[in-house]
From Swiss-Prot:
Biological source species: Citrobacter freundii
Stated name of the protein: Citrolysin protein 1
Taxonomy of the source species: Bacteria, Pseudomonadati, Pseudomonadota, Gammaproteobacteria, Enterobacterales
Function text: Bacterial hemolysins are exotoxins that attack blood cell membranes and cause cell rupture by mechanisms not clearly defined.
Annotated GO biological process: killing of cells of another organism
Protein keywords: Cytolysis, Hemolysis
Length: 618
């Protein structure tokens, strides 16, 4: 028998070898098995409705189709299909009417509203793992898709999602979307060119506190990630210094910015609910085109299927824009990859971290941007009272960010990488990068002079109100760009000093009269609708309309409806009237209808300026 101290050492080596063996096995095991053994059991239990708190049980998801190649694309139970694109019946009925009775679809899963109050699913295309179309079949409830009887459906997610919760989008129907996917890569682990654009949130009950062990696990993961990718590139003398700063921010956020009572030892944050948000690629390919091309009103080369993606983009972008809430402290755990000099973190570490954190009182936001080299970011929010936030997780160099920034912001092509820019802006707020470097330099003029999205660029500068923001705002305006969008965001953030005169000062040499006219029109329109919006908001509406003529309708109507200052029915009537008079901007009406899913019933849960900002751009 070994001595006690040798026995302890032996046990440690056995545990270490076991972990190494598990990792080796993980490298060779199919990912669906990893998901089934770990993440699936952790995440896919009962959860509650986002709005009405009704417990939704998990249901059996036996696949009727055994084609493994399309399992991740074609989710063959009605619960899973709802998870792809969960709209309320009224919403889909409206879209169905606009599309001439064709229904509304996304990618290959096609939903259609029928008079007998049953959802019929039509598979219009099926894809293999590489995105190639392998069949073009149409199926309904009598074929591959199993439907319950009406009595059974009353107790199912199928009934609950579409009939009890107005914001059905927030449901991951019975949590089957992740389960049926069967591959961790769907969560953003690989550069799959997904054919779906949506954002899905799951809410489930948690009871375990945040313990020192979990804090240690997060910090150790951060340290491992640092050592894994930076040890070979860092001088030994500066290794400790950089490691310290690499760990300091998440630890500081964890212990000092939770807004909780004194944090010491074991910590319990006073929240009994949690979220996991999966935001799939905004620029998913549809019909051979990029979503940036599809929804661009100035782009005449719209790809096939664009009408099926517009509302999806609205909902997804609204979720992304909510990430601008800079008031929430965040614990950065170093789970990000693909951004130029940053290589992919081993999936094994990602899985372990996700398993550790998935059932705790936190919120996880996963982003996947395969075409932009900003493929994924994960942020753990310590105050889940807010909705969703994105974060740039690495203190990458200014040169890397500047290169990425100017690569994706192309002059005159109306292709603005908004999501990556949100991350960059948030990174500047977190102190990771010097944001001013991005907007200074020789490329400023050539990138902004012809761009129609300078207002959107200015928004990113105005995340941090102050003299620097005003300075940059003036720079963009002098270059001839449309700064109205930035001023709109700034006003929504609470700068009540933005008067008509100050707005016009930014545009001294560029269409000053037109701006003043539209500011006045926005104020008159808001008053006529009975919205009683503050002066700053009416001015914002007119200012944003400067870039797109009919845009003032969208801004004022939707915002007023969301703030309960006018009824939603009044807003939608006006939007439809606008659509009938101006087909050029008809797609805005569909976007606004989708936006209802983000404002209906959530006004009391989300700060006013976040709602305002969520409709800043699509």
């Amino acid at each position: 028998m070994l001595p006690e101290h040798l026995a302890r050492i032996s046990r440690r080596y056995v545990i270490l070898l076991a972990l190494v063996g598990l990792y080796v096995c993980y490298l060779f095991l199919p990912r669906w098995l990893v998901l089934a053994c770990g993440l699936r059991r952790t995440l896919l239990s009962c959860h509650t409705c986002f709005l009405c708190e009704i417990v939704i049980p998990s249901h059996s998801t036996q696949h009727t189709s055994r084609n493994d190649k399309v399992k991740a694309w074609c989710l063959t139970s009605e619960y899973s299909l709802i998870g792809w694109y969960a709209f309320s019946g009224e919403m889909c009925a409206v879209i169905n009417e606009w599309k001439g009775g064709e229904g509304f679809g996304i990618g290959r899963c096609f939903f259609k509203w029928r008079s007998d109050d049953v959802w019929r699913v039509e598979v219009v295309r099926e894809y293999d793992w590489y995105g190639r179309i392998i069949s073009r079949s149409i199926r309904d409830g009598a074929g591959s898709y199993r439907y319950q009887s009406r009595s059974d459906r009353d107790r199912s997610c199928f009934h609950h999602v579409f009939h009890h919760c107005p914001s059905a989008f927030y449901h991951l129907a019975c949590a089957n979307l992740v389960r049926s996917c069967g591959d961790l890569r769907w969560i953003g682990m690989a550069n799959l060119n997904l054919y779906t654009v949506t954002a899905i949130c799951v809410r489930w009950r948690v009871t375990k506190p945040l313990t020192g062990a979990r804090i240690t696990a997060v910090l150790c993961t951060r340290a491992l990630e640092f050592i894994w990718y930076r040890l070979k590139r860092v001088r030994p003398a500066s290794l400790f210094h950089q490691l310290f700063h690499h760990l300091r921010r998440p630890f500081w956020n964890l212990l000092r910015q939770t807004g909780c009572p004194a944090v010491a030892g074991r910590t319990r944050i006073g929240m009994a609910k949690s979220y996991i948000c999966l935001v799939l690629p905004r620029n998913a390919a549809v019909g051979g085109g990029c979503l940036d091309d599809i929804i661009d009103p100035q782009n005449n080369k719209q790809s096939p299927g664009s009408s099926e993606m517009e509302a999806a983009f609205a909902v997804t972008k609204a979720a992304a824009n909510r990430a601008s809430c800079r008031k929430i402290p965040m614990l950065h755990i170093g789970v990000s990859w693909g951004c130029r000099s940053i290589r992919r973190i081993p999936e094994f570490i990602y899985v372990i971290v996700l398993l550790i954190l998935s059932t705790k009182h936190k919120q996880i936001a996963v982003l996947n941007r395969p075409k932009d080299r900003c493929e994924a970011s994960v942020g753990i929010i310590l105050d889940p009272r807010e909705f969703v936030i994105m974060s740039w997780l690495f203190p990458v160099s200014n040169s890397v960010i500047r290169s990425q920034f100017h690569t994706t912001y192309r002059a005159g092509k109306h292709k603005v990488n908004t999501w990556c820019s949100h991350l960059i802006a948030l990174a500047s707020l977190r102190g990771f990068i010097n944001f001013s470097v991005i907007y200074h330099g020789s490329s400023l003029n050539e990138n902004y002079q012809k761009s129609q999205d300078a207002g959107e660029h200015a928004v990113l500068l105005l995340y941090s109100p102050g003299p620097m923001a005003q300075q940059h705002c003036g720079i963009v305006a002098q270059e001839g760009g449309d700064v109205c969008g930035g001023l709109y965001a700034r006003a929504c953030l609470g700068d009540r000093s933005l008067t008509v005169q100050r707005l016009s000062d930014y545009r001294v040499s560029y269409q000053r009269l037109r701006l003043l006219e539209q500011l006045r029109a926005g104020r008159i329109l808001a008053t006529a609708l009975g919205a009683k919006l503050p002066r700053r908001d009416a001015a914002c509406a007119g200012c944003v309309a400067h870039g797109v003529g009919g845009d003032v309708w969208r801004r004022v109507l939707v915002r007023a409806a969301c703030w309960r200052q006018i009824s939603y029915s009044a807003a939608i009537v006006n939007l439809m009237w606008w659509r009938s008079h101006d087909d050029e901007y008809s797609y805005y009406a569909r976007l606004d209808c989708s936006s209802r899913l983000f404002c209906w019933g959530h006004v009391r849960k989300i700060p006013e300026w976040v709602i305002c900002h969520s409709f800043l751009y699509y």
